[in-house]
Amino acid sequence: RSLRIRSAEEADAKNICDLFARTHEQTDYLLAYPEENSYTVEQEAAFLKKLLESDRDVMLLSEVDGDLCGCASVCVVGAKYKIRHRAEFGISVDKSFWGLGIGTKLTQTAIDCAKTAGYRQLELDVVADNNRALRMYEHAGFQEFGRNPMGFQSKASGDQTLVYMRLEL
């Protein structure tokens, strides 16, 4: 099997929307439920166009043998001077591709992109029960800096604690 990681393009909009629906149905650890994705393909394409025009933000896609199986993003926390050195990191991988190291490779590529873009800190939050993700982030060098015991409210399990993590670049 062949893994390819590349930047998303406008033409990827439909496949990204489909991936979002799939991955958000497969786990309760992501921010939204599939039905909460209100982006149309056209809106996703416009969002991707804006990302492509940015010199600092990026959405990465992972493909195995040409099939889209994951995505990761690095986006500025805010444009104000005091916070523009910080970027947010998000990632999701189709469950049928878990355990193949794709998340690790996407994460490392995102870290490299964040460094190249001049960010000084990469941040994320992760559900405390998501042990696989926590291990991956810790292995990549992220460190916990706080917790929110009511960070997510899950339909299935009620309150979920969020772990806040950061990586100095």
What are these regions (language model features)?
Residues E123-V126, E138, Q143-Q160:
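Conserved catalytic-core motifs of GNAT/GCN5-like acyltransferases
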Residues D12, G66, G101:
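Conserved G/P- and acidic residue-centered "switch" motifs that form tight phosphate/ATP-binding loops
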Residues L3-D18:
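A short beta-loop-alpha structural element at the N-terminal edge
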Residues N37-S96, T107-T109, C113, E168-L169:
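Acetyl-CoA-dependent GNAT
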Residues T107, A114-D125:
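Conserved GNAT acetyl-CoA-binding A-motif
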Residues L100, T104, T116, D129-G146:
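Conserved active-site alpha-helix within GNAT-family acetyltransferase domains
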Residues R1, D159-L169:
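Terminal substrate-recognition subdomain of acyl/acetyltransferases
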Residues D18-E35:
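Helix-loop element at the rim of GNAT/NAT acetyltransferase active sites that forms part
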